[in-house]
Curated annotation (Swiss-Prot):
EC number: 2.1.1.-
Enzyme class: transferase
Organism of derivation: Methanocaldococcus jannaschii (strain ATCC 43067 / DSM 2661 / JAL-1 / JCM 10045 / NBRC 100440) (Methanococcus jannaschii)
A Pfam cross-reference name: Thymidylat_synt
Principal subcellular localisation of the protein: cytoplasm
Active site, UniProt feature: C139
Descriptive protein name: Putative thymidylate synthase
CDD domains: TS_Pyrimidine_HMase
Length: 222
């Protein structure tokens, strides 16, 4: 287990990557890719408005901007899932459920509610997709919001999180979603807590990125 508490996503990222490369357990994925993993990584961002993209993030600012736009407004690309669809248009029977509208409505009605929750996993779809060797299912599983002391506190749970290539985009995009909800509810935005059950780095696939951005950690790969 790893716990990190930092003011910004960037400062958390800069601590997270060396920690996984140094202390992570070597795990071969079901697709035979070598990773280093720390189970149950919890990261608290105490000043989420600091959304500067870290210089060592391999995919850069444009990737973060694109992810955030797709999360909030959707994508024209067709996948077995996308987070915008699962949060804003969750497929259930013949319905599409807007879980974000529900969260805003719930918190406007009951400021102390513990029920402002959205999920992404859809058993009817995702169990079948998971049977496909390369099927793509949501990594983000749950988003919950609490209003305490006049501020909105956000917690997210990922079943699986690529620390090197995905964490920064995931966190900044979801913080932007949280800021949107806070504005709709009329409160300030508090902290962002990011829980990844499997937080990992693909050490062979992303070796060149590790070599370029974290060369001091190469000694931990063998």
């Amino acid at each position: 287990m790893l716990c990190i508490k930092k003011p910004s996503v960037a400062s958390a990222f800069n601590e997270l990557i060396p920690k996984i490369l140094k202390d992570g357990e070597v795990v071969e994925t079901e697709f035979e890719e070598r990773t280093k993993e720390i189970r149950n990584t919890i990261i608290e961002i105490t000043n989420p408005k600091l959304k500067k993209v870290p210089e060592k993030y391999p995919l850069g600012e444009k990737a973060v901007e694109e992810y955030t736009k797709n999360l909030l407004y959707g994508s024209k690309n067709v996948f077995s899932y996308d987070y915008h669809q699962r949060l804003f248009e969750y497929p259930y029977a013949d319905e599409k459920i807007n879980q974000i509208d529900y969260i805003i409505e719930k918190l406007n009605q009951q400021k102390n509610s513990r029920r402002a929750v959205a999920i992404t996993w859809n058993p009817k779809i995702d169990i079948e997709v998971s049977r496909d060797e390369r099927g793509s299912v949501p990594c983000l599983q749950l988003v919950q919001f609490l209003i305490r002391n006049g501020k909105l506190y956000q917690t997210v749970i990922f079943r699986s999180n690529d620390a090197l290539l995905a964490f920064v985009s995931n966190a900044i995009g979801l913080i932007t979603l949280g800021e949107y909800i806070a504005k709709k509810v009329g409160v300030g935005y508090g902290t962002y807590t990011h829980h990844a059950i499997s937080m990992h780095i693909y050490v062979d696939r992303d070796f060149d990125y590790i070599k370029k951005y974290f060369p001091e950690c190469l000694k931990y790969l063998w």
